[in-house]
């Protein structure tokens, strides 16, 4: 019978050496101190992998600074209040998306949203999946909720919403508007006195701003959102519905940051869908991908904490 080899004589993996197993958890969480400006979680009408409490718990464990809850059909201002109440230490914010479920471009809906107990309803997204640009792009319907008229200028109802946003210092997000529509929204928002404006996932197919349009938006004071979901989409995406969206590569996003300037961007995930990475894991993937393309940790902090923090809490 062959002698049994002593365990101590087997070749060992040196401390810190990685072969076919994951490395040890990082000493410092990649998302520590950062803000996720675009979190999807249950309850929802769409499949979500985890709920508000679970999303917050994952981010708290990784020492993130704050999260923004987004839902396409209902306000999340009240959910942010409850999340904070049940999870001391969590900084959660919410808002409202002006889709058909809340009456479209509805100033009253915005008024009631920001009045919700706690005052954590801070964002107003213009239409997303009901946006005229979105439904026409994906051929979902002949027309959707419009934000501009035939003259390319913001509609009167849009201007009424923007007045409320200016009065209450709410963050105006362009939703799934086309680049010309988004620029018209930014112009109208500035005219109304709004100074907190975000171009929602500026790189995604349904928006897909050119570099020159990004520069124009930035020159008007808007911040541009980069989302962790972008690199997961495209023809080879692991989920069928994501194959309808163009992939946004880390290389692309890094080039936008270098060309337009890191000070004009914020970071988000747009994650929470069933089958996708958790929001913190997706955020870590985004950070690693951008840094792999030459973006520095200081630039990550600028986009993921400083700029986003000024919008939310400044």
Show the residue positions of the predicted features.
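Short acidic/histidine-rich active-site segments
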Residues: 227, 262-279
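N-terminal twin-arginine translocation
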Residues: 2-20
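Active-site environment of divalent metal-dependent phosphoester hydrolases
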Residues: 42-44, 74-78, 99-102, 131-134, ...
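Glycine-rich phosphate-binding "P-loop"
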Residues: 37-47, 129-131, 136-153
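Mid-to-C-terminal alpha-helical segments outside catalytic/metal-binding sites
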Residues: 1-7, 280-314
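Histidine/acidic residue-rich metal-binding segments in metalloenzymes
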Residues: 18, 25-26, 52-57, 79-82, ...
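An N-terminally biased module of ancient metal coordination in phosphate/nucleic-acid-related enzymes
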Residues: 18-91
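Hydrophobic faces of well-ordered beta-strands that scaffold small-molecule active sites
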Residues: 33-39, 67-69, 93-96, 124-126, ...
């Amino acid at each position: 019978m062959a002698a049994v080899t002593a365990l101590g004589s087997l070749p060992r993996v040196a401390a810190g050496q990685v072969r076919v197993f994951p490395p040890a958890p990082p000493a410092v969480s990649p998302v520590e101190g950062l803000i996720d400006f675009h979190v999807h979680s249950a309850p929802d009408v769409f499949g979500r992998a985890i709920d508000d409490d679970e999303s917050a718990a994952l981010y708290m464990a990784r020492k993130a600074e704050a999260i923004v809850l987004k839902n396409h059909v209902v306000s999340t201002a009240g959910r942010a209040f409850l999340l904070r109440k049940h999870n001391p230490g969590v900084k959660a914010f919410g808002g409202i998306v002006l889709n058909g479920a809340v009456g479209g471009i509805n100033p009253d809906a915005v008024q009631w949203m920001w009045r919700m107990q706690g005052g954590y309803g801070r964002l107003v997204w213009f239409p997303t999946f009901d946006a005229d640009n979105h439904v026409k792009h994906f051929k979902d319907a002949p027309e959707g909720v419009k934000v501009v008229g035939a003259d390319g200028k913001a509609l009167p109802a849009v201007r009424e919403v923007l007045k409320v946003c200016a009065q209450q210092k709410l963050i105006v997000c362009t939703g799934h508007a086309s680049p010309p529509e988004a620029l018209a929204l930014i112009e109208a928002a500035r005219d109304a006195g709004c100074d907190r404006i975000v171009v929602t996932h500026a790189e995604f197919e349904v928006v897909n701003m050119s570099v020159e349009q990004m520069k124009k938006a930035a020159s008007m004071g808007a911040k541009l959102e980069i989302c962790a979901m972008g690199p997961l989409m495209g023809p080879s995406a692991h989920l069928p519905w994501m194959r309808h969206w163009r992939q946004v590569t880390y290389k692309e996003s890094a080039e936008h940051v270098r060309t337009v300037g890191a000070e004009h961007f914020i970071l988000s995930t747009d994650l929470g869908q069933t089958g996708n990475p958790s929001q913190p894991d997706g955020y870590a993937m985004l950070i690693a991908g951008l840094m792999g393309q030459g973006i520095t940790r200081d630039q990550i902090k600028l986009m993921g904490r400083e700029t986003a923090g000024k919008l939310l809490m400044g």
